[in-house]
From Swiss-Prot:
Listed GO MF terms: ATP binding; glutaminase activity; metal ion binding; NAD+ synthase (glutamine-hydrolyzing) activity; NAD+ synthase activity
Gene3D superfamilies associated with the record: HUPs
Job description of the protein: Catalyzes the ATP-dependent amidation of deamido-NAD to form NAD. Uses ammonia as a nitrogen source.
Gene: nadE
Sorted UniProt keywords: ATP-binding, Ligase, Magnesium, Metal-binding, NAD, Nucleotide-binding
Protein name from the UniProt record: NH(3)-dependent NAD(+) synthetase
Subunit structure, interactors included: Homodimer.
Binding site for Mg(2+): 39, 179
Family assignment from sequence similarity: Belongs to the NAD synthetase family.
Superkingdom: Bacteria
Taxonomic source organism: Thermotoga neapolitana (strain ATCC 49049 / DSM 4359 / NBRC 107923 / NS-E)
Length: 290
């Protein structure tokens, strides 16, 4: 946990960091992908305070499976901050390339039924979906699921850069330290950015910073989710809360005593780190020079 004074200092440091890097690399402003979640809310707010609202452009890129509540939260945040924004559905692009053929059509099915169906597939196609995701292993149907959700972030990345380069802006990312260490991001998707201002902050610390920055309560109370597959939350993938996960990650990083933690959860975090490190390190895989 960060003390109140440290949170304020961190906020000011990040505002200065964004402003300095934008100028150092000759960018004219910043583009941020806004999802309606806490990470993008914090980053958008930081960019506005660093650069002014006239030099920040927000892009909201929902698709068929996106939460309507999150979409509204994203729009409300942009309007509250007074930034220029564009809302563009990527459903037509995903449909055109055949992504939705990997998943049954929703038509008029209630969201609750879709979520139950997804959870059933999540639990039956793999004994440990998150680890299998990091290892790129599993039955064919599971691998199709990986392709299904990863393409969404990669399409978003292309559109973010399209909007940024038209303006001479930087793409500012929203990945936090917990996501980075555990591999909860899409390679060449949401990790492909120019500046990552919150990658040193664990998820629980991002929440503390969000409170300092007056991020709307509705966003703070929402269960963190990648909003890529209906019904799947971050904590469901990890099999533990962010509070537990961050506490274990911090202790491992500082080589502190773990005897008061659940041994099974500690072992799980270690496994996640083992595979996520390889995921990060092997970008791209190259031929070793002799």
């Amino acid at each position: 946990m960060l003390k109140s004074q440290r949170v304020t200092t961190m906020k000011e440091s990040l505002i200065s960091f964004i402003r300095e890097k934008i100028e150092e690399y000759n960018y004219r402003g910043a583009v941020v992908g806004v999802s309606g979640g806490v990470d993008s809310a914090v980053v958008l707010s930081l960019c506005v305070q660093a650069l002014g609202k006239d030099r920040v452009f927000a892009l909201i890129l929902p698709e068929r499976d996106s939460s309507k509540d999150s979409l509204k939260d994203a729009v409300d945040l942009c309007e509250t901050l007074g930034v220029e924004y564009r809302k563009r559905s990527i459903t037509p692009i995903l449909r055109k390339i055949g992504a939705y053929r990997l998943f049954p059509p929703r038509f008029f099915l209630p969201n609750s039924i879709v979520k139950r169906y997804v959870l059933n597939r999540w639990n039956t196609l793999s004994k440990d979906p998150f680890l299998d995701d990091l290892r790129n292993t599993g039955p064919e149907e599971f691998l199709k699921g990986l392709a299904y959700y990863r393409i969404k972030h990669r399409i978003r990345m292309c559109l973010l850069y399209f909007e940024a380069e038209k303006r001479g802006y930087a793409v500012v990312g929203t990945t936090n330290r917990t996501e980075y260490l555990t591999g909860l991001y899409v390679k060449w998707g949401d990790e492909a950015v120019d500046i990552e201002p919150i990658m040193h902050l664990y998820k629980t610390q991002v929440f503390e910073l969000a409170k300092e920055m007056n991020v709307p309560e509705k966003i703070l109370k929402k269960p963190p989710s990648p909003d890529l597959i209906p019904g799947i939350t971050d904590e469901m993938a990890f099999n533990m809360s962010y509070l537990e996960l961050d506490r274990i990650l911090m202790k491992l990083e500082k080589n502190e005593d773990l005897s008061d933690e659940d041994p099974k959860k500690v072992e799980r975090v270690k496994k996640i780190l083992e595979f996520s490190e390889k995921y990060r390190r092997d970008i791209p895989i190259t031929f070793d020079r002799i």
